[in-house]
Amino acid sequence: MSFPTNFVWGAAASAYQIEGAWDEDGKGPSTWDMFTRTPGKIWEGHTGNIACDHYHRYKDDVAMMADLGLKAYRLSVSWPRVLPDGAGRVNDKGLDFYDRLVDELLSKEIQPWVTLFHWDFPYALFLRGGWLNPESPKWFAKFTEVVVSKLSDRVKHWITLNEPQCFIGLGMGNGEHAPGFKLDMREGLLAGHHALIAHGRAIEAIRSKSKQPAQIGWSSAGGVYYPATQSPEDIAAARQATLSVYSESVWNNSWWCDPVVFGHYPEEGLRAYGEAAPRFTAAEMKVISTPMDFYGCSIFFGVAVKASSSGSVVIARQPPGHPHSHYLWKHTPTALYWGPRFFTERWKLPMVITENGMSNSGDWVSFDGRVHDAARIEFMSSNLLQLEKALREGVDVRGYFAWSIMDNFEWAEGYKHRFGLVHVDYETQRRTPKDSAYWYGDVIRSNGGALDKFASAGTDAPPYVIKETMRYINAHLSEMFNIKDLAAHMRCHPDFLSRKFKKHTGVDLSLYIRRIRIDHARELLKNPDLLIDDAAEQSGFTDRIHFSKVFRRLTGQTPGQYQRQFRVERDASLHTPLKPKNPRSVHA
Ligand code: NOJ
């Protein structure tokens, strides 16, 4: 696997989606606090009032992250928790929460990656026009200064805005998200322009206030198109679709990322939006393009496209029955290969996958007390394998954050969706790590090696599951274990393990275990004083009869005969004078 040793393996969540404590310790309301109270806006009238109660349970949650092996955690700071009115008075108790959270993470060697805006805009500032107010970048810069002054002695990684496409497109365009506006394109893009200036101002604020050199990026969500076939025409079509600006929506990459990286809106976008495009000054564009260190993006799925005979881009529909998530998002792992490739080609910045994951409809606690989310394991492994392919081909990907560390409030969808690696029972707040959480821990510990389990067969190198199985057998020879135990250790089904083992080694797994045990016993029996019972026990056999039977079947001798013969041979060799085999060659 090509993951570099310092690859950042993390998981993410955001303040409103997990914290709860919506009005505690002096927190001011956010637009989401108000929006969730509007009848009909959120599925079954859910709110984030309590959510996962992470505000009170953060210590246990961090301990759980550490147990799972997480190396980094992407959290967001609630702006109105820190500044209840959005500007001016600082709420020390609110700021203190993040201070403690960061300490807790660091005490468990988990790197905090802090997002400054993940959609919970202060309601007080919304009443002053929100992102439509040209003052909004200054408000955001001030808020950033407060947070950075407090946390930057320990926090190094910052993300300014989370997915402007979403909070402008859904919050101001179709009204599905807070504040629930349905503005026309001109106003939506103006709000977006201010948000972009806010992004630049936040970078300036971080650079000037940070107590250590900071790594700064943002998180974009503009959509990925991938080629339906590997033909150069389809690849070109996918590139074009991924980087185009469409006049009817703000769902694109380049309108948002060109200004941030190049300092200008894309020509194609200015043409597409025409009169609706915002007026801007050179000074504003300079602020917007304040250099950042990495390009963060969330990728959950992609859309397959191909080139038509006339050269235009057409969507290549998936056949009926193509796998999809509970959200009905298609399972399209190649998006994790093509997205980073196209983005790097254009913006030439190191990439971080700030979110990737799936909402799974079958995530409930089973009779055995566990959550068996095999689909998520399959989803993440195939996505990660595609990301690995991009890395192998030279795309500079620095990190990957699973969305999400735990089930949470999915905005307008309420608690309908479960994206977590950890299941949350919202009535009891009980956390149950899903199978995928343990699996992801293995992936992290092996720096991606565990993904081998899922890599397609056909490569010569034995996959991780085989290597680890062999290692385990050798390291535990004196213990009694069977294939079921081995499979439980590898977190896979016994049949899967046996099949895979046979396929890659040509040997039956149970025969392999017996052979290794007998080889071990043969070494032990070279000691003439060792009792056969002891040899049996030390090579993991339940009793002497079974041991002798297997020994005989595999070597043609009983353990006693072997021991006697070994002794005779050894004694004979001790008494035979050493003679060169070919005396002529010695004298030549
Ligand atoms: C992106 C958003 O940042 C996050 O808040 C949301 O829950 C996930 N997508 C899943 O929709």
List each model region and its residues.
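The short coil/loop that forms the "turn" connecting the two helices of the helix-turn-helix
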Residues: L70, C492, F541-T542
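Short hydrophobic/aromatic patch on the recognition helix
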Residues: L497, F501, H546-F547, F551
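Terminal helix-turn-helix DNA-binding modules in bacterial transcription factors
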Residues: M470-A475, M480, K484, K503-T542, ...
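Catalytic domains of carbohydrate-active enzymes, especially glycoside hydrolases
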Residues: R57-S78, T290, F294
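Active-site mouth loops of central-metabolism enzymes
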Residues: W43-H56
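Core residues of bacterial helix-turn-helix
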Residues: H489-M490, L497, F501, S539-G540
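Active-site region of glycoside hydrolase catalytic domains
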Residues: M1-I42, A66, D85-G86, L95-D368, ...
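Key DNA-contact positions within bacterial/archaeal DNA-binding proteins
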Residues: D495, I545, G560
